[in-house]
UniProtKB/Swiss-Prot annotation:
Region (Disordered): 688-707
Natural source organism: Arabidopsis thaliana (Mouse-ear cress)
Biased composition range(s): Polar residues: 688-700
Taxonomic placement: Eukaryota, Viridiplantae, Streptophyta, Embryophyta, Tracheophyta
Catalytic activity of the protein: a 1,2-diacyl-sn-glycero-3-phospho-(1D-myo-inositol-3,5-bisphosphate) + H2O = a 1,2-diacyl-sn-glycero-3-phospho-(1D-myo-inositol-3-phosphate) + phosphate
Protein's GO biological process: phosphatidylinositol dephosphorylation
The protein's name in its UniProt record: Phosphoinositide phosphatase SAC5
């Protein structure tokens, strides 16, 4: 793809008219929001009319005021309003979240406290710590509607969306985009605030339309953000985990399932792992990123939440004979990430379920992928891996994890990663274009002719083309375990690309691997709380760490109880709040209130309704679930025996054009004796190499390549290569007992663990306070899990 593509830079940050701190003042007739930039070099004024209770009237002063000019202006405002009620300071804030209207007055949502959570290429990233909602019309002109029970209930409902948890923004970096899109996108004037990951897009729609800019608002992403500084062999680097939750078809577990008519899926989350090397000031920053996604199975399927049935039946709706919605979904993935779409489907097999639940979706999913692939050329076909993680996990967490790492290695060979060297401050793009400013953004010709701009160019060496998409039934517990495996393998690749050497990252005793596991567990808990109503189950990670015990088992049991309670009793209010926040439901006087509608009427589009067309779907009392589609079925045995050596580019070698392929079949491996922990000398004697995941056949051990980026041949791991053990492993069949679902996968019977503890015979009335004895017995019954 050419050698070292160049990126035309954005304007230097110091020249951007970015407002970062604001003070709100009020008179009886207007609000005045005064904003300044970070360097306090200029001030701007936004006037908000308080005399109209039905319309939003905003006026932007084009003048850029100095500090002294603003002080004089405020003095005049105080004097001029002495007799009419004064010029009062209301609050300090850090940006407008948006404007919302329920039945009558408009409200303004402000960030009143922020917290710094990290930096990306010199751009500060913040989380919301506190927010405030302020009614715009003066109380003297508000009608009775503004104080009606329905209005107050809508206000309370909106507060269910807790803006102080997991909402993030940046003034100078498009946090809704991956690093590759930020640095590689040179288009101007894109509607950035309308992208799928901007959760306040609806709330800011009117102010952006009126002012034709976005300097007063911030674009919020919802999900997860964590940044950690590390050091390996004296070399310092920073790794960042970002999870971006899509606002399309967003909601709670049983009320948002599957796919909608236009291809949007439930629980759609993009996870980006960024690793950047710490370099002296003034040098370009070597930085890499890998993106993976999760999302509900993109079919029309549903489960009806029930107080009496914690594991409701899965109902598959076959109304879409040509799988058009599913095709829309994967076409969208190609547009976003490139042609190489790899699907890791963790649903259970027929032998893995005593009662067919997930099996129904697994079979239809495979059928769908085959249908889609019929009309596509080889390059564009979906590539699917069917892997019953529940079944393989029963043979040992290490073995299951080893499988997942193999899949991740193959996926990385297909998609590659993004790597560049970027100056601090790159990627801001034209954050704002405001014709009122004295220093308009220069043209590209002007930028190219400026010597100073040369230092703002990013050197791009590798591009990610495609994405790994993972799903289980809920895209929570098992999916997070699999995404950690991909993150761990990717981290080794990223460190190798950055030229950072050290002990093997995939060695789970490596502190770096443990640090990354902590981050993915925390992300998993956060995403599970958002979608499922409880933290994620911890059994898989605990088994991987070797610290699964009775205390952790009981904790997972109560996690299942909390998830069940939230799904049965709280999800309806949460879904209503999300629908109002995102603009999927817009209250109107004279029409039914949201809480008066049937539980799933948010999803349909009726004539004259006040619902958003993007959430339309046929009327059905259940929720539709979305997961991932596959191309064909991967035979694990073929995968681990395959002799394919990837090519790696040097740091200045350009982007590879390697065309890697692997087969897909609907079979399961016969042996799962993977990842046995061995002493180093035993490992070397058994395999002739310290490498995990060798790429060649077991018949040629001496010629195996170093095909795991991030690991040199001198490294000695504590894990036996999966291929070697697979070749000499036993051929006995895998038991299908003790399988578990997403919700309860970590709450298996103690008879299948190394623990000798057993739960006592259920009796008494205080087993689970607040729940019936029958339900308590169900919770503690091994058969239920």
């Amino acid at each position: 793809m050419g050698s070292e593509p160049r990126f035309e830079p954005r304007p230097e940050l110091i020249d951007l008219p970015v407002l970062q701190k604001f003070k709100l003042y009020a008179t009886p007739s207007n609000f005045y929001l005064i904003g300044r930039d970070e360097n306090k070099s200029f001030r701007r004024i936004l006037k908000i009319d308080r005399r109209d209770q039905n319309e939003l009237n905003l006026f932007e002063d084009p003048t850029r005021y100095t500090k002294d000019e603003m002080r004089e202006l405020k003095r005049r405002m105080i004097v001029g309003n002495e007799e009419s009620g004064g010029f009062k300071a209301i609050t300090t804030c850090y940006g407008i979240i948006g404007f919302v209207r329920f039945l009558e007055p408009y409200y303004m949502l402000l960030i009143t406290k922020r917290k710094k959570v990290g930096e990306i290429c010199g751009h500060t990233v913040y989380g919301i710590a506190e927010s405030q909602m302020i009614a715009i019309p003066h109380p003297s002109i508000q009608s009775k509607v503004a104080k009606s029970e329905a209005e107050l209930r809508y206000k309370k409902l909106l507060s269910v969306v807790d803006l102080s948890k997991n909402f993030y923004f940046s003034y100078t970096y498009h946090l809704m985009y991956s690093l590759q899109k930020n640095i590689g996108n040179t288009e101007r004037g894109n509607p950035h605030d309308n992208t799928m990951f901007v959760w306040n897009s609806f709330l800011t729609r009117e102010i952006r339309k009126i002012l034709q800019n976005s300097i007063w608002t911030v674009a919020l992403i919802y999900g997860f953000f964590q940044q950690t500084k590390c050091s390996v062999s004296g070399e310092k680097f920073v790794f960042t985990i970002i999870a971006r939750r899509s606002r399309h078809y967003a909601g709670t577990r049983y009320l948002r399932r599957g796919v909608n008519d236009i291809g949007r899926v439930a629980n759609d989350v993009e996870t980006e792992q960024i690793v950047s090397k710490v370099v002296p000031a003034g040098q370009k920053i070597p930085i890499t990123s890998v993106v993976q996604v999760r999302g509900s199975i993109p079919l029309f399927w549903s489960q009806e939440a029930s107080v009496f049935n914690p594991q409701p039946e899965i109902i598959l709706n076959k109304k879409d004979a040509n799988y058009e919605a599913t095709q829309h979904h994967f076409q969208n993935l190609r547009q976003r990430y490139g042609n190489r779409i790899i699907i890791l489907n963790l649903l259970k097999t027929v032998t893995g379920e005593k009662k067919h639940r997930e099996t129904i979706l697994r079979g239809e999913f495979a059928k769908t992928i085959r249908f889609i692939n019929k009309g596509m050329d080889r390059e564009h076909r979906l590539k699917a891996i069917h892997f019953d993680l529940s079944k393989h996990y029963k043979k040992g967490a290490d073995g299951a994890f080893n499988h997942l790492c193999i899949f991740s290695r193959k996926s990385l060979e297909l998609t590659d990663l993004f790597y560049c060297k970027a100056p601090s401050g790159v990627g801001a793009e034209e954050v704002i274009y405001d014709s009122f400013f004295n220093n308009p953004i220069p043209s590209q010709d002007e930028e190219a002719s400026s010597p100073e701009k040369e230092d703002m160019k990013a050197d791009i060496f590798l591009l990610q083309n495609g994405v790994l998409r993972t799903n289980c039934i809920d895209c929570l517990d098992r999916t997070n375990f699999a995404q950690y495996a991909h993150g761990l393998v990717s981290l080794g690749h990223q460190l190798r690309t950055l030229g950072i050497s050290g002990p093997p990252v995939v060695d789970l005793n490596n502190p770096l691997a443990i640090e990354l596991m902590d981050a993915y567990q925390k992300m998993g808990n956060t995403l599970a709380m958002q979608y499922g109503g409880s933290e994620a189950h911890s059994k898989m990670f605990c088994d991987l760490r070797g610290n699964w015990n009775m205390v952790m088992r009981q904790r997972d049991i109560f996690t299942a109880v909390r998830r069940y309670y939230s799904n049965a009793y709280q999800d309806s209010d949460k879904q209503n709040a999300i629908n109002v926040f995102l603009g999927h439901f817009r209250p109107r006087l004279g029409r039914p209130a949201l809480w008066e509608l049937d539980s799933d009427q948010h999803n349909i589009g009726r004539s004259g309704s006040n619902l958003d067309i993007e959430n339309m779907r046929p009327l059905i009392r259940r929720s539709f679930s979305d997961n991932i589609i596959m191309d064909c079925d991967l035979n694990l045995e073929e995968l681990v025996r395959e002799n394919s050596q990837p090519t790696y580019e040097g740091l200045n070698g350009g982007v590879s054009g390697t065309n890697l392929e692997f087969p897909f079949y609907e079979t399961e491996p016969a042996s799962l004796s993977f990842l046995s922990v061995m002493r180093n000398e035993e490992l070397m004697r058994e395999t002739g190499s310290g490498q995990m995941f060798q790429g060649s056949s077991s018949n040629s051990d001496s010629h195996r390549p170093n095909d795991i980026p991030g690991f040199s041949h001198s490294y000695v791991t504590k894990f036996t290569p999966a291929e070697d053990i697979f070749e000499r492993g036993s051929s006995k069949s895998v038991s299908s007992d003790n399988l578990f679902t997403d919700r309860d996968e970590s709450v298996t019977s103690l008879t299948n663990t190394n623990s000798s503890f057993e739960f006592p015979i259920m009796g008494g009335s205080d087993l689970l306070p607040g729940f019936s004895n029958a339900f308590a017995r169900w919770v503690f019954s091994a058969r239920a899990w």
